[in-house]
Amino acid sequence: MNVLGNYQSSGASWLSGGLGRFAYGEESYRPSLAFELNAEYRYRPLSSLEFKAYVQAQESNNSRSVSQVGIVELAARYSYDINFNQQVRVNVGQFFLPTSMENIDQFWESPYTLSFSSLNSWIGEEFRPIGLDLNYRHSFDDGNRLSAAVTPFWGNDSMGALLAYRGWSYGRQRTAYNDVLSVPKLMSLSDSGPFAGQRDDGTKPFGHDLDGKPGYALRANYLTERLSLNLTWVDNMGDTTLIDGEYAWRTKFSIAGVSWFVTDSFEVLAEASSGSSTMGAAPGVDISFYSAYLMASYRFSEYRLSARYDQFGIDDRDAMDQENNELGRSYTLALMWAGEESQFSVGAEILYLDSKRTRFLDSGDTESDTESVSLGLLVQYQF
C-alpha cells in the first residue's frame, strides 16, 4: 500500500484533463494526496507452471480519469529446461516486457525514485503486450547469461496517442486493462477538428484490438554479475486508416538499456529510446520521438540516494495545423529508506523540468509551458 503526497507547479495534471506534466494535481501550487493498493496473486500447480494476477486500486483527492480498480497484469508462464545451460520460457496473457532498467521491483515499481523516467512513465501508460512471449536463455559456464525473445501481441493499437496529443510526462501510472486516460482538449480533437472521431473521454491504451492484426517485439539481454545490457524493438503494426471510436496508430520504437554495478553499493543505469508514430490517412499525424536518461544510485546502510538526468523530444513531421513539437530535460534527486526488517519504506523526491511545448486548445487559447517543479513524498507498507 502506497500513500503519496505531491506539490507541483506544472498546472492541472494531464490525468485531470489538463496539460500538466505530472500525474497529480488539479492546479499549480496545490498539495495533492493519492493512495495506491497493489495486490498480486501467484499460483504454481507445477514447478514449471505459474499463474499470476496483478490488481491495482487507487484513489486521489484530485479528479482523475483513471479507474479506481483494475487489472494490470494477468498471465501464465511455463518454463522448460532443455538442459543444464538452456531454458525456454513462454508467457501468455497481458504482462510487462522486462525492458526497463529502473522498474525492477514487484508491481513494476522503481527502488530508485518516486516518479519514473519519461520513457518508463510512457511505457507504464501506453505499452503492455497482450499476447505471447517466447524467451530463450543460455547460461554460460562462467555464470553469464544471454537471452533472446520474440513477442507477438494485440490490444495496443492506440499506442502513440498520448505522445502526440499530450507529449511526454512524469509519473508512476500503470494503466489497467480497459482503462481510459484523459487527453487534452485540443482544437484538432474538437467536433469541428480533423480528428473529431476520437472518443470524447480520452484514449484507451489496452483493450479490444482495433484492427485484428498483431504487433511484435524483439529483444535481447546479456547479463553478468555486475552488468546487464538490453536491446528491444517494438512495432504495433497498427492500421493508421482505422477509426473505431479510437484511432489506430502505427508506433515503432527501439530501446537500449544498461545497468552497471560499479561496486556493490554504487550503480549506474541508463536507457535510450527512439521511434515514430503515425495516425490517419494522409495528411495525418506523423511524429518522431526520443527519450533518454542517465541515473546514478548509491546505497548506504538502509538508504538509497539516486540522481537522474532525463531528456526527451518530439518532432512534428506532418503538414497538419496542430502543433506536436516539444523538447525538454529534467533533473531528479530522490532519497529512499527501506529497513531490512521493516514493512515500511519512505521516499522523498524533487524533480525540476525545463521544457518547451505549445498546444492549440478547442477554446481558441494557446497553452505553452517552460519550467516546473515537482516535490513528492512516499510512504509504503508491504504486507
Give a label for each model feature:
Residues 4, 26-164, 221-225, 295-298, ...:
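Outer membrane beta-barrel
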Residues 5-33:
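Surface-exposed strand-loop-strand hairpins of Gram-negative outer-membrane beta-barrel proteins
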Residues 13, 65, 102-106, 158-169, ...:
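Outer-membrane beta-barrel and related beta-rich outer-membrane complex signature
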Residues 13-21, 69-71, 106-112, 164-173, ...:
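Flexible, surface-exposed loop regions and adjacent strand-edge segments
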Residues 18-23, 113-119, 197-205, 239-242, ...:
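Extracytoplasmic loops and strand-loop junctions of Gram-negative outer membrane beta-barrel proteins
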Residues 26-33, 65-70, 121-128, 208-212, ...:
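Short sequence motifs at beta-strands and strand-loop junctions characteristic
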Residues 122-224, 232:
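Aromatic- and glycine-enriched pocket-lining scaffold segments that form the walls
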Residues 212, 221, 228-383:
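Outer-membrane beta-barrel pore domains
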